[in-house]
Amino acid sequence: MDSTKEKCDSYKDDLLLRMGLNDNKAGMEGLDKEKINKIIMEATKGSRFYGNELKKEKQVNQRIENMMQQKAQITSQQLRKAQLQVDRFAMELEQSRNLSNTIVHIDMDAFYAAVEMRDNPELKDKPIAVGSMSMLSTSNYHARRFGVRAAMPGFIAKRLCPQLIIVPPNFDKYRAVSKEVKEILADYDPNFMAMSLDEAYLNITKHLEERQNWPEDKRRYFIKMGSSVENDNPGKEVNKLSEHERSISPLLFEESPSDVQPPGDPFQVNFEEQNNPQILQNSVVFGTSAQEVVKEIRFRIEQKTTLTASAGIAPNTMLAKVCSDKNKPNGQYQILPNRQAVMDFIKDLPIRKVSGIGKVTEKMLKALGIITCTELYQQRALLSLLFSETSWHYFLHISLGLGSTHLTRDGERKSMSVERTFSEINKAEEQYSLCQELCSELAQDLQKERLKGRTVTIKLKNVNFEVKTRASTVSSVVSTAEEIFAIAKELLKTEIDADFPHPLRLRLMGVRISSFPNEEDRKHQQRSIIGFLQAGNQALSATECTLEKTDKDKFVKPLEMSHKKSFFDKKRSERKWSHQDTFKCEAVNKQSFQTSQPFQVLKKKMNENLEISENSDDCQILTCPVCFRAQGCISLEALNKHVDECLDGPSISENFKMFSCSHVSATKVNKKENVPASSLCEKQDYEAHPKIKEISSVDCIALVDTIDNSSKAESIDALSNKHSKEECSSLPSKSFNIEHCHQNSSSTVSLENEDVGSFRQEYRQPYLCEVKTGQALVCPVCNVEQKTSDLTLFNVHVDVCLNKSFIQELRKDKFNPVNQPKESSRSTGSSSGVQKAVTRTKRPGLMTKYSTSKKIKPNNPKHTLDIFFK
């Protein structure tokens, strides 16, 4: 009977510890905790919050019970082994101790409440809190004497202090004041780390070094009267102190009374300032030590905002945070930068004072008899066996007085969210409406930061304080309110349907977006063929703009680039080089080039014409984007009809002129350089020249029409016979190879289907056909313009190009290589048929024909556009 009663009393004490007052905050020393906790328990008993706290307390007690059982099973041998391991780690930490930095933690005193009291002087001597009846953000020091503190429900605070005035928050005003404070902090450390609106870390080590050589004039500031305008520039006028400032400011300067100048001392004040009756010529000269620098910071903050700040000075961030709470409000504390001073400070420090140790960890450590940091160090071996590696590492850092000395500012954001707490909402319409509001607010925040994400998460807390999070990841990034709400609505609908027929009773809802693409993802993200063509088009435009300023010898040739580059980088490089050939052709054959200008130049002229036509008040003169001819004042329907006609019959002669120009340019450059070209016919030849860098590019099926359909076979035979001596033997390879673009008298540009030639050049330009990009679609593999605007047919062509190597192997097995068909131009329909045949056939035996240095083919030989762009 007695044991049951003792157990009940112990459980009640544990609940009081969890739900009772946490007095580890400035201004709450010496309070009657028993009386305050009794009021808190009476105000919450029977509520859902009380029931939720009971459930959490049971969970914590269960964890402690499991921990004590684990402790009982630890042997002395395990303890000795753990002791050696922890001591070895402690020795490493001790050797890495860094005492060379001076870290300052600035914390504004009761920031939100202080701003409200400044703007409404009637509140100065009254207990006030900022927040609502549901939750308080902060309280002033008058209210703290009654036990009212931040993170306390307003209705409980009213029980503790009936005369408490609760002021609604005004975050725009708080942000404006915070900006003023941060402007001052940036003068001492441009890379300071802001933790919130009222809290920041500074590393003033560099400032202290520079300050040693500063004259007094640079360290002098004047004390102002009630004006909140700060005297940033030393040597300017000052006004009289207000009564409030007189009661605060002198405390800052007790250690340096000789620095205060008596009234009437000119001290670099000009004649007008001396004769101004509003000026009280009190100036303060701050020293060069860390203490003096922090006094100066706090003085400037007070002069500019009329608000006070507390500060901690220490060798690392952990100690500086604890020090700033030591002499609150309006005070500062320093730990000298030596090991003995650090250990003396840590010795009797309660573990709850350290940031990162909350009420649950405090209770678990208390069950092991650990209350101070000294006891934390004494039990280090036991803690390493009972807690996770991350936890006991952190405990050991605390017990040795170690912390971070590196301030990281504006790290990469991982997510952005918005959430609201409210009274119970159980109607689906209201829940959807609230979700839409949250999505709109989140979209605005994303727009300000210029962020987009792929994962949308909703957070729901029901009336029983049970929290659920549901997430959905989409393939493309989203950022608008409509896109986010479309995803969040489905997630919310799933939860509503899960509770049907009972309503979903919520008291909190939040929406979060994450999975932001990083810089590397944004750089290489290619999701569609259109996107690929646009990217290539932009690359060509950039090349055209910078080509005149760049020496031709400084260009990086495609065959000399690194093998490690991606396929898209290689293709862009080839297209850039092809465009460079076209530009050189303009210098060599200026007259002939005028009749066939490069596409980008024509496009530029077209854009200029469009801009002129848009600004015209008369009828618009439209230009065809295909033939680039002005169409006069015609309707959009007529222009569309004309564009369709142009797309059905492109100018082949112009295309051939561009090709011929590119070939002539490349030939002349090679003649100038007199660099011999050697064919890559054997592997030994490649190994004999290891310094030569090569890039292979596929020579896929061209699928282009010739001018005269009746001369297809003859043109192919002519090409094959003319260059049979120049080309190497066909090498079966998965790598991509670059083939010569030959000048042909029949004005036919075609590539053989079955022959994959490999080609190498030593430090010379490759022959590349002119790549024409723009309105028409160009295959990203073979760089051949397709005479179709149908994306389905275009995709079929790309599939055929991607599967060329499989088609070749299949055809070599089924047919005699000597009697291969000579037609190089096939319709897209037949290409589709070949593609289907390839996807139905697996030829694992063909892998043995490849060199061991080649990449192993996956089990599924089917190449799709989705895989290609991944």
Curated annotation (Swiss-Prot):
Top-level EC class as recorded in UniProt: transferase
Disulfide bridges in this chain: none
GO cellular component, one term: nuclear body
Coiled coil: none
Claim: Nucleotidyltransferase is one of the keywords in the record: yes
GO biological process: cellular response to UV; DNA damage response; DNA repair; DNA replication; error-prone translesion synthesis; nucleotide-excision repair, DNA gap filling
Binding site for Zn(2+) 2: C779, C782, H797, C801
Protein name: DNA polymerase kappa
